[in-house]
Design a protein with these regions (language model features):
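Interdomain/boundary linker segments immediately adjacent to catalytic/signaling cores
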Residues: 1-61
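Active-site metal-binding core of divalent-cation-utilizing nuclease and nuclease-like domains
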Residues: 17-33, 58-59, 82-109
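Short, well-structured hydrophobic secondary-structure segments
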Residues: 54, 59-86, 256
Length: 264
């Protein structure tokens, strides 16, 4: 955990050996503190849990650190701390409720962005599969607050001393606001997510803008990535009852390569 905090820019607080602090100069020196001895996060005097006045959280699971890193990224991007609500409670039906990890509101205190945080790897992939299957938690929460403009499935991890993050983003279209339930929303959704437009250099806070990928956005493929891509292709081909799967895979992959070369 300490390596992650240092990579985020936290430093030891003066005269407090077990407390790390990070000031955010773009928010009038707003700060977040981490008490290593108590395993506790103090999100400051403007970021609260579920509209309460509580800003403290005990770190009990790895996902808590993903939420912390996401909040840090939001603050650095320019989102105001008073517009960030943690563990926002929404009814989920049949007398139950769920907690949205992060709700970002706009200047009018209306929902702008709903963020569900997951740990890197299996948990994120599982949530992404659920999202594509029936909408998952994010679609359920949106049905309770249709002012939201963006739904985000988010993860991050410190890999080889470099902080990596992924986000799958759904831009809310006006027709989605007219849906009566999660299934109706899911049926109308075009099943397409974006992976940029929230934390990129070209966009500003409270304004979502996604862009098409270009060759400079490409990264070297890893062994685990190639296996993941292959398995996803096979899943799509099976779903569409394609018999000659290896040949179909090769042709689709070749088309992608041609498209990449054509964009250069």
């Amino acid at each position: 955990m300490k390596d992650l905090l240092i990579s985020l820019g936290f430093d030891y607080k003066e005269n407090a050996k077990d407390v790390l602090i990070k000031p955010y100069t773009n928010h009038e020196k707003y700060s977040i503190e981490i008490n290593l001895e108590k395993n506790n996060i103090n999100f400051g005097d403007k970021i609260f849990f579920n509209d309460s006045r509580n800003s403290n959280q005990n770190i009990t699971k790895p996902e808590d650190l993903v939420v912390l890193e996401c909040v840090d990224r939001l603050l650095k991007k320019g989102y105001k701390p008073q517009n960030i609500i943690l563990e926002k409670v929404y009814p989920t039906g049949h007398g139950t409720s769920g907690r949205l990890d992060i709700l970002v509101t706009n200047k009018d205190n209306k929902a702008f962005m709903m963020i569900e945080c997951k740990t890197w790897g299996k948990e994120f992939d599982k949530a992404y599969d659920k999202l594509k299957k029936d909408g998952g938690q994010l679609f359920t929460y949106f049905q309770q607050d249709k002012d939201a403009q963006i739904l985000v499935l988010y993860t991050s991890e410190l890999i080889n001393k470099k902080l990596e993050y992924k986000n799958e983003i759904i831009k809310i279209e006006e027709e989605y606001r007219n849906t009566s339930n999660v299934k109706d929303f899911f049926d109308r959704w075009n099943k397409v997510t974006k992976n940029n437009g929230v934390f990129n250099d070209w966009n500003t806070p409270y304004n979502y803008e996604s862009k098409a990928l270009t060759p400079k956005d490409l990264i070297d493929i890893k062994q685990e990535d190639s296996s993941f891509i292959f398995n996803r292709f096979m899943e799509i081909l099976r779903h569409n009852v394609v018999s000659d799967k290896p040949n179909a895979f090769n042709k689709i992959f070749t088309l992608f390569l041609c498209k990449i070369m054509d964009e250069k």
